[in-house]
């Protein structure tokens, strides 16, 4: 009987040790995801600011005007390349992730963040710097709270995914339509729905990243998962920020 009790206790200790190892591995994985995501946001912010500084200047009347570089980037067909290049890269990264080395995937992720930074320099032309800063910190606080909830909640958020993806496609379609309608009311509605959708996606993606973690993954697979998880959260944060900026940002 005593041998049986010892065997049971030993099995329980092994199970507890394995659970602790998985928990520690999951924490390390999530920290890596958040570090990649935060670094990419930093790259985007720095590149956007530097691009703006080189693309615009203030004239004698105190008005913001484009420099020759700014006219090239935002006043010609190149503006379409600035939009399409990051989009093409993120699709390539998503489709080819299984065939890429972890380091290559990470490099492409940061290249994407830099390209998007060039494109997002235009927000400094439309909004005041103080309101951009304010909305950034609001977005960061909201993102942190939503991601924490997605990580800690016991509720299964899987069912939310289909509705959120449908909402995302609805936002894209409505935004394309509004390019022609130029309706302020529709833009306001799109922004509100966008905030709700990307808030939900933040929690949903966080839980999905957590559930996709596997302690048996090797370094390459774990690295790929970290990059794709960081990319998902990065896109959630950037779009949440842009939607909030459209709602409460102060235009120049």
Where are these regions (language model features)?
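A hydrophobic alpha-helical transmembrane-helix feature that marks the membrane cores
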Residues: 1-252
């Amino acid at each position: 009987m005593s041998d049986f009790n010892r065997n049971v206790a030993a099995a329980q200790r092994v199970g507890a040790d394995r659970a602790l190892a998985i928990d520690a591995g999951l924490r390390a994985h999530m920290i890596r995801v958040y570090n990649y995501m935060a670094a990419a946001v930093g790259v985007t912010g720095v590149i956007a600011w530097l691009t703006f500084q080189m693309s615009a200047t203030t004239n004698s009347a105190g008005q913001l005007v484009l420099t020759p570089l700014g006219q090239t980037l935002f006043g010609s067909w190149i503006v379409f390349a600035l939009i399409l290049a990051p989009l093409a890269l993120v699709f390539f990264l998503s489709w080819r992730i299984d065939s890429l080395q972890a380091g290559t995937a990470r490099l492409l992720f940061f290249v994407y963040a830099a390209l998007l930074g060039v494109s997002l320099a235009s927000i400094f032309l439309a909004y005041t710097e103080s309101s951009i800063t304010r909305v950034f910190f609001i977005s960061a606080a909201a993102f942190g709270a939503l991601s924490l909830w997605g990580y800690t909640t016991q509720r299964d958020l899987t069912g939310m995914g289909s509705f959120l993806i449908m909402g995302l496609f609805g936002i894209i379609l409505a935004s394309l339509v509004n390019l022609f309608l130029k309706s302020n009311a529709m833009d306001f509605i799109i922004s509100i729905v966008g905030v709700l959708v990307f808030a939900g996606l933040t929690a949903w993606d966080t839980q999905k990243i957590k559930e996709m973690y596997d302690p048996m993954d090797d370094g390459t697979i774990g690295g790929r998962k970290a990059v794709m998880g960081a990319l998902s959260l990065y896109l959630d944060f950037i779009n949440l920020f842009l939607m909030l900026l459209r709602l409460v940002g102060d235009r120049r």
